[in-house]
Amino acid sequence: MPNMLEIYKCNHCGNMVEVMAGGGAPLVCCGEEMELQVEGTVDAAKEKHVPVIEKTANGFLVKVGAVEHPMTDKHWIQWIELIADGRSYTKFLNPGETPEAEFCIKADKVTAREYCNLHGHWKTEL
């Protein structure tokens, strides 16, 4: 059963959804159940995938990895999301862009998540 803010992906066509309200039925695409994307379960270099959150004067800067993640046509970060106080903020990225996002919000506790097209879903909290 899908829960709020979970990410699901279709293993056939690549469709990805974020659950806005949990329901009682599984998510289906291309005739099969979509796969829940669990953070940090793919065997990959953590130093290039775990988001790094920096508090700034305007809010928060989220960078992907302690070592900058590549942003090539074949390997890139698709999006960065910041969750705070029951709200979700997302920046979508393209190959060639810098894998970071600034979110101008005030909050005491935040969670940053990102999605790598090859190595999946990663998160950290501050």
UniProtKB/Swiss-Prot annotation:
<feature type="binding site">
    <location>
        <position position="10"/>
    </location>
    <ligand>
        <name>Fe cation 1</name>
    </ligand>
</feature>
<dbReference type="GO" id="GO:0050605">
    <property type="term" value="F:superoxide reductase activity"/>
</dbReference>
<keyword id="KW-0408">Iron</keyword>
<dbReference type="InterPro" id="IPR004793">
    <property type="entry name" value="Desulfoferrodoxin_rbo"/>
</dbReference>
<keyword id="KW-0560">Oxidoreductase</keyword>
<keyword id="KW-0479">Metal-binding</keyword>
<dbReference type="GO" id="GO:0005506">
    <property type="term" value="F:iron ion binding"/>
</dbReference>
<dbReference type="InterPro" id="IPR004462">
    <property type="entry name" value="Desulfoferrodoxin_N"/>
</dbReference>
<keyword id="KW-0249">Electron transport</keyword>
<dbReference type="InterPro" id="IPR002742">
    <property type="entry name" value="Desulfoferrodoxin_Fe-bd_dom"/>
</dbReference>
<feature type="binding site">
    <location>
        <position position="116"/>
    </location>
    <ligand>
        <name>Fe cation 2</name>
    </ligand>
</feature>
<dbReference type="InterPro" id="IPR051233">
    <property type="entry name" value="Desulfoferrodoxin_SOR"/>
</dbReference>
<feature type="binding site">
    <location>
        <position position="69"/>
    </location>
    <ligand>
        <name>Fe cation 2</name>
    </ligand>
</feature>
<keyword id="KW-0813">Transport</keyword>
<feature type="binding site">
    <location>
        <position position="30"/>
    </location>
    <ligand>
        <name>Fe cation 1</name>
    </ligand>
</feature>
<dbReference type="InterPro" id="IPR036073">
    <property type="entry name" value="Desulfoferrodoxin_Fe-bd_dom_sf"/>
</dbReference>
<feature type="binding site">
    <location>
        <position position="29"/>
    </location>
    <ligand>
        <name>Fe cation 1</name>
    </ligand>
</feature>
<feature type="binding site">
    <location>
        <position position="13"/>
    </location>
    <ligand>
        <name>Fe cation 1</name>
    </ligand>
</feature>
<comment type="function">
    <text>Catalyzes the one-electron reduction of superoxide anion radical to hydrogen peroxide at a nonheme ferrous iron center. Plays a fundamental role in case of oxidative stress via its superoxide detoxification activity.</text>
</comment>
<keyword id="KW-0216">Detoxification</keyword>
<feature type="binding site">
    <location>
        <position position="119"/>
    </location>
    <ligand>
        <name>Fe cation 2</name>
    </ligand>
</feature>
<comment type="subunit">
    <text>Homodimer.</text>
</comment>
<dbReference type="Pfam" id="PF01880">
    <property type="entry name" value="Desulfoferrodox"/>
</dbReference>
<protein>
    <recommendedName>
        <fullName>Desulfoferrodoxin</fullName>
        <ecNumber>1.15.1.2</ecNumber>
    </recommendedName>
</protein>
<comment type="similarity">
    <text>Belongs to the desulfoferrodoxin family.</text>
</comment>
<feature type="binding site">
    <location>
        <position position="75"/>
    </location>
    <ligand>
        <name>Fe cation 2</name>
    </ligand>
</feature>
<dbReference type="Pfam" id="PF06397">
    <property type="entry name" value="Desulfoferrod_N"/>
</dbReference>
<dbReference type="GO" id="GO:0019430">
    <property type="term" value="P:removal of superoxide radicals"/>
</dbReference>
<feature type="binding site">
    <location>
        <position position="49"/>
    </location>
    <ligand>
        <name>Fe cation 2</name>
    </ligand>
</feature>
<dbReference type="InterPro" id="IPR038094">
    <property type="entry name" value="Desulfoferrodoxin_N_sf"/>
</dbReference>
